[in-house]
Design a protein with these regions (language model features):
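A recurrent domain-boundary module in secreted/ectodomain proteins
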Residues: 176-194
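Short, solvent-exposed loop/turn elements at domain surfaces
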Residues: 41-48, 211-217
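Contiguous, well-ordered beta-strand patches that form the walls/edges
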Residues: 69-166, 209-217, 222-225
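Surface-exposed interaction/gating patches
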Residues: 31-37, 41-45
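Acidic, glycine-anchored loop motifs typical of Ca2+
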Residues: 51, 56-58
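Short, exposed coil/turn segments at beta-strand boundaries within extracellular/luminal domains
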Residues: 1-16, 180-183
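Short, exposed beta-strand-loop hairpins at the edges of beta-sheets
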Residues: 160-161, 168-182
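N-terminal helix-cap/turn-to-beta initiation motif at the start of protein domains
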Residues: 12-35, 192-205
Length: 225
């Protein structure tokens, strides 16, 4: 008989370790969903120049106005080119950042709206500049509702990162306003979560009356609220 010794050489490339700022955006899963914050997800304010005032999720220094809930974005189509709804004005819209540097915005149905490349520049978690933590730059206006307030439909591609954790992100567009000059700026507040949008519908909490006992009456219709 014959004996065949078959060998095959495999080239294994270890995954590149992600930078800290990329881990925040895409997680160690390599992709991550971001949605509108529950309040103040889009609005405007004055450029007060103090980045430290952006000290929590949805907290905007110099805030003048913001949508009370994401549903309010449907009333802000005057800032969109042509005033046309594209789907990201819906409360359930979301965007996905991936480790290969692509961000895609989606309608609540999962249909893609727009996509582009992204990168984080000059990330400085110490905020040495006194203002931003870094810049989030996209190749085109690809984020959720990326329109400058009172900008005549101007799409934003360079954002100042003001608050940045795995759970929440606040972005600002200054439109060249002088720091501390109180000129109008636009802000966006997002929350981050699972790599799967279907798992981000809400947070599980206990109901105040959520634990107890009772008799098995057999009427499922009695569980009506």
């Amino acid at each position: 008989g014959t004996f065949t010794d078959a060998t095959k050489t495999l080239k294994c490339t270890p995954p590149t370790e992600l930078a800290p700022e990329m881990l925040i955006l895409v997680s160690d899963n390599g992709k991550k969903v971001w949605k509108y914050a529950a309040t103040n997800s889009y609005g405007n304010g004055g450029h007060g120049g103090a980045g430290a005032d952006f000290n929590g999720p949805g907290v905007v220094g110099g805030n003048w106005w913001g949508v009370e809930t994401p549903d309010g974005l449907a009333d802000q189509l005057g800032h969109v080119p042509g005033g046309t709804a594209t789907g990201d004005e819906a409360a359930g819209a979301y965007m996905v950042f991936t480790e290969d540097g692509v961000v895609t915005s989606y309608k609540p149905t999962g249909e893609a709206i727009r996509s582009g490349k992204f990168e984080v520049k000059n990330y400085d978690p110490e905020r040495s500049s006194g203002w931003e933590l870094g810049k989030l730059v996209t190749s085109e206006p690809a984020l959720l509702f990326p329109w400058m307030i009172n900008g005549g439909g101007k799409g934003v591609t360079e954002f100042d990162i003001m608050y940045f954790t795995p759970q929440a992100m606040t972005l600002v567009y200054t439109n060249g306003q002088a720091s501390g000059g109180w000129g109008e700026i636009t802000h966006w507040c997002f929350i981050g979560g699972s790599p799967d949008p279907l798992t981000m519908e809400g947070t599980w909490t206990y109901d105040a009356n959520g634990y107890g006992k009772g008799g098995h009456g057999g009427a499922g219709a009695d569980f009506n609220g």
